[in-house]
Amino acid sequence: MFKYRNKGRKGRNTSMENMYELIAPCHFGLESVLKREILDLGYEIVTVEDGRITFRGDVTAIARANIFIRTAERILLKMGSFRATDFDELFEGTKAIPWEEFLPRDAKFWVTKATTNKSALFSASAIQSIVKKAIVDRMKQTYRVERFEEDGDEYPIRV
């Protein structure tokens, strides 16, 4: 039987530029349990909201959280954040995110889920479509191609 022992963050070589905001969604009511699991792994909590906790960690935190956290549905990497009051702002804000740093040239991706909170942008399918178009546009510009082939590994994206 494998037992994990938390040795804390002492001796870990991480710089702020290698830190990511990670989101751990969970079922409502399990936030305090999830918070304890994240703290036990030695990571800094950013926010606690209904059904999710945001925390900071390096690349190993992604793997460690996926292995040792039991109450989170999954571990998500926060790619960016911006305010969008219309679909043009959504497109431009999405396009401004450096997707090429996270998605390879041949990435196959789709927007799996789009949720809004008190927003005029309430059509999930329209949000998914706009986000997909903005990412493809960014990748086409970055790699200087006319057609963006999506024949590589799969990357689901949530908004």
Regions inferred by a protein language model and the residue ranges of each:
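Non-catalytic nucleic-acid substrate-recognition regions in nucleic-acid-modifying enzymes
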Residues: 17-155
